[in-house]
UniProtKB/Swiss-Prot annotation:
Compositionally biased tracts (Basic and acidic residues): 28-38, 185-194
InterPro entries documented for this protein: GED_dom (IPR020850)
Protein name per Swiss-Prot or TrEMBL: Putative GED domain-containing protein DNM1P46
Region Disordered, annotated ranges: 18-46, 173-194
Transmembrane segments annotated in the record for this chain: none
Entry superkingdom: Eukaryota
Amino acid sequence: MLQLAGVSNSTCGGVRNVSVETRNVKPQGKDSKAEENGSHSFMHSMDPQLERQMETTQNLVDSYMAIVNKTVWDLMVGAKPKTTMHIMIYNVHAPPHGDQGVHLLGAAVQPALAWEREDTHGGVGRVGTAARRDAASQSCCPTCTRLGTRRHSWRSRQSRHSGATRLAWEEIDTPGGVGRAGTAARRDSRGNEKTLLEESAEQADQGVHLLGAAVQPALA
């Protein structure tokens, strides 16, 4: 028909090519609809049991990820206070039973109260020293008590010996008192010196015992 109408051969060839291309082109909307229909048909063609397994697996994965995220958050943000509370609750020993705590507190506070009482009521001088010495001698052992008694007896003997020595030297200074009286006086003075040395040694031992008795409660 084109040839009969007087159309050239080149024009006829161009029209043929356009018609062929038009036949080969398909609309895109139809292709997308076909793909969606194919996927839906595939999903519907799956086994229902397999679908349930896939849903269960997905739920488990979501729950595990939530647990992991919460754990990481606790470690990064809330680790310090939780660790502190754990140490305070689980690593503290059990409280004392009954009145044991009260007795322990009283034993710890009593020495401080005793020292304050002595300082307040003027017991720092001789009274405080005597009270401390008596308390130490009573708390240490009976030997310390005997040593305290021996110390008082030593003071009385010392006063008596000093008086006797003074009288002996007065007799020596008087006329006719240089004989046996002078020798006896010198002997008595030497004996007094030995007695003083012995008593000083006993006093040193007593000081050691008193020091041990005073330090023992602090070490305990």
